[in-house]
């Protein structure tokens, strides 16, 4: 008789409270779902979802990115989130609206955009 090996499916741990980090730059949108300690649950970016070039920085691309990342996070049982949003991009509002449409309980919204205190010199003016 042959020895049969039994494959045991690895059980995903359930996480009920998490943090959503949204980075909306001028060129892309990156969304990361983490637990309270900062361990990554799921992440997605507009470039990774098939958007290329200038379409990565659109509000629609941010909405699709939130949808993909939240589907993966819901597999872990995530229900309550805290939102940390940063960056100067125009897709910040649509990313937040997409999160509200995912039926999460939102406890707080924090803007973590870095503000330069006269740091680096800006690029030269564009002449057309």
UniProtKB/Swiss-Prot annotation:
Official protein name in the record: Small ribosomal subunit protein uS11
One Pfam family this sequence matches: Ribosomal_S11
UniProt entry keywords in alphabetical sequence: Ribonucleoprotein, Ribosomal protein, RNA-binding, rRNA-binding
NCBIfam families membership: PRK05309.1 (NF003698), uS11_bact (TIGR03632)
Gene name in the database record: rpsK
Family: Belongs to the universal ribosomal protein uS11 family.
A molecular-function term among this protein's GO annotations: rRNA binding
Gene Ontology annotations for the cellular component aspect, listed alphabetically: ribonucleoprotein complex; ribosome
Gene3D superfamilies on file: Ribosomal protein S11
Self-association and partners: Part of the 30S ribosomal subunit. Interacts with proteins S7 and S18. Binds to IF-3.
Top-level taxon of origin: Bacteria
Its biological purpose: Located on the platform of the 30S subunit, it bridges several disparate RNA helices of the 16S rRNA. Forms part of the Shine-Dalgarno cleft in the 70S ribosome.
Keyword Magnesium: no
Biological process terms in GO annotation: translation
